Amino acid sequence: MEIDFVRLTGSIAYATLFIVAAGWDAWTRKIPNWTVAALAVLFLFAQLLTWSTPNWLSSFSAFGLVMLAGVPMFARRLIGAGDVKLLAVAALFAGMENLLLLLVATAIAGGALALVALAARPYAGVFGGWIRTRAGIPYGVAIAAGALHVGTTTGMLAISQRLTHLQL
């Protein structure tokens, strides 16, 4: 088993950036633009280095579809702008092939997060009123969970390659 260090570095960067965005969103309810920009740059490097990402057309189609649906939702204040941008950059990595998987995994994680938030409300005093004073849930956490699920399920985060030689 050979370890592909470029893939290993990319996988660590992918996971780290999504985890940082999720943590930042959980703490401040804002997703920093630099995390989204860094993920977009990572996607470009992944494409150039032939990492396990979908082709350009598939990736940008998924990105465009998420933006097309997300911008009106942001305009109606149903979702934050950072959430739309983070989901769109996650869609770049997922491509059209795995966009449904990304959206379903994100929705399931969001539902679980909402249940945890509801269950934690009676204990708001323990958290210094943090739960009660903040409306909604930090959906960046759910988006990051969905993106990490897609990364592990599709093999995008695999750090080794098994080389098979066929003799005909």
Regions found by a protein language model. Give the residues of each.
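A membrane-topology feature that recognizes alpha-helical transmembrane segments
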Residues: 1-79, 84-168
